[in-house]
Regions:
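Short cysteine/histidine-rich zinc-coordinating motifs and their immediately flanking basic loops
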Residues: 32-41, 108-109, 122-127, 144-148
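Short Fe-S-cluster ligation motifs
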Residues: 48-84, 120-169
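Local cysteine-cluster metal-coordination motifs and their immediate loop/turn environment
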Residues: 14-32, 82-117, 130-137
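Conserved aromatic-histidine-acidic binding/catalytic patches
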Residues: 30, 99-103, 121, 162-166, ...
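Charged, amphipathic alpha-helical linkers/stalks
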Residues: 135-224
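Short, charged low-complexity linear segments at domain edges
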Residues: 1-11, 52-96, 104-109, 113
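Low-complexity, highly charged intrinsically disordered N-terminal segments
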Residues: 9, 25, 29-57
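Hydrophobic, aromatic-lined core segments that form the binding pocket/scaffold
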Residues: 188-445
């Protein structure tokens, strides 16, 4: 038996590429893999300038090439970027010459579908958009009614699925609970995220494959404990630790700064972030910058997002669908230590670094902080983090190393209050500021 259905944010239906009007370009600054089927199709093109250009622009993968080298999961070929790190098949107007001359059917799969992201869990499609596209980031983040969930129809016989996952009815129930948690504004967003963490712990305590009876009881018990305030994790015990937050943001951003291609748009955001937290010749230590980070949050970030609560909610929902949270990678990419709690830690890493960068950018622009700054920050940071195949593992391992995995660590990373919080405990005495690691050299895209 299989169940077909769709979890579809409204924005996946609304997206339309704006072409040469776009302030960025998806034809550069990263690897563009070419599948074997696309390559073979290119070989059928008649001789001419386009065929010559395509042949000169494709680099076949050497033996042992991996996804992180830009050749994609298939490991067959990729576009050989030019000296400006842009696709040489792009026209002077910024448009794809393959698309314009022979049509979209000749595009490699990544070029044909980007920024749409398709994820399948037991036959249920989960559609999202890659926020590395500026127009996608706009329609995902800025629409107050951005998503809707379409329940699957009755089960039908047909396909079978070999994924090491529970049956489809359990998956749909878990997906529904997860999305309802994120969108429930009866609780502040940091508490909603911790609710997700508690749920992940409870799912991991179930027998393997999350049997339907046990999983249904787990979800019912979870809903009840949230409703009556008897959740196993004491939200009131969470300390506010802006120093731990800033330290983690700097380390996470610096981690990818060493591995990813940094675009000029992202450099602008990093420069604004540094300005917003008060980085300068006489302020370079973590201790000296924490006060600026806290001020940026309390005076500019928090008031803005209190007026626009849907922005971070939409970011989380899109990330949940894009990353198949809490189910994790598909079978091909699933590792032996997969767990819902591990997926939660990775989700917190995504959210923490994005939120931390936005806090600094808000501090730089102060009262002028706007949705345009949000879109640029999220889009350019997503281009750096979300498309790097090593980020989930590196980010998870970093938070484990810092002791910020699981619920207590997540709580320290995501809770900020201007007043009424518990006294800050002395978790660490680090005097090292990692901002110099973030002084990237921009690639010219």
């Amino acid at each position: 038996m299989s169940r077909t259905g769709l979890v579809a944010p409204k924005y996946t239906e609304d997206f339309v590429c704006i072409g040469s009007a776009c302030e960025d370009n998806c034809c550069g600054s990263w690897g563009v893999p070419i599948t074997r089927s696309a390559y073979e199709k290119y070989q059928t093109l008649p001789d001419g300038s386009l065929r010559t250009l395509i042949d000169a622009s494709i680099l076949l993968a050497p033996k042992g090439a991996v996804d992180s080298d830009g050749f994609g999961p298939e490991g067959f070929a990729k576009i050989r970027m030019n000296e400006s790190n842009a696709c040489p098949i792009k026209s002077a107007e910024g448009l794809c010459q393959i698309h314009s001359q022979v049509g979209p059917s000749y595009l490699s799969s990544i070029c044909a579908t980007y920024p749409r992201v398709f994820r399948s869990v037991r036959g249920a499609e989960q559609n999202a958009l890659a926020l590395s596209c500026p127009e996608a980031a706009r329609i995902v983040l800025l629409n107050p009614m951005a998503w809707k969930q379409v329940e699957p129809p009755a089960p039908t016989s047909g396909e079978t699925y070999s994924e090491d996952l529970p049956n489809s009815s359990v998956l749909w129930a878990i997906r529904s609970v997860v999305l309802n948690i994120v969108s429930n504004r009866a609780y502040p967003l940091w508490q909603r995220l911790l609710h997700l963490g508690v749920l992940c712990q409870q799912l991991d305590a179930l027998p393997p494959d999350w049997p339907e009876v046990e999983a249904s009881k787990c979800l019912d018990d979870f809903d009840r404990t949230v409703a009556d305030g008897t959740l196993s994790f004491d939200m009131d015990s969470v300390s506010v630790d802006p120093s731990a937050q800033l330290d983690a943001v700097l380390r996470l951003a610096g981690l990818m700064g060493k591995k990813s291609i940094i675009t000029p748009r992202f450099v602008e955001c990093i420069d604004a972030f540094k300005t917003g937290i008060g980085y300068g010749p006489t302020a370079t230590t973590l201790a000296s910058l924490t006060a600026g980070y806290k001020t940026a949050h309390d005076r500019f970030f928090a008031p803005f997002f209190n007026r626009h609560p849907h922005i971070l909610e939409n970011y989380l929902i899109n990330t949940i669908l894009r990353c198949r949270f809490p189910f994790g990678p598909d079978d091909k990419n699933r590792d032996a230590v997969h767990s819902a709690t591990r997926e939660f830690t990775t989700l917190i890493a995504h959210f923490s670094v994005m939120r931390g960068l936005l806090i600094g950018v808000a501090g730089a622009h102060r009262g002028g902080f706007s949705t345009a700054h949000v879109v640029q920050t999220v889009q350019s940071a997503s281009k750096c983090f979300d498309h790097h195949p090593e980020f989930p593992t590196l980010a998870h391992d970093l938070l484990v190393k810092l002791g910020l995995d699981r619920l207590n660590g997540a709580a320290l990373l995501i809770r900020n209050q201007k007043s009424g919080s518990r006294a800050l405990g002395k978790r660490r005495s680090s005097n090292v500021c990692l901002i110099p690691e973030m002084q990237f050299s921009a690639e010219h895209a």
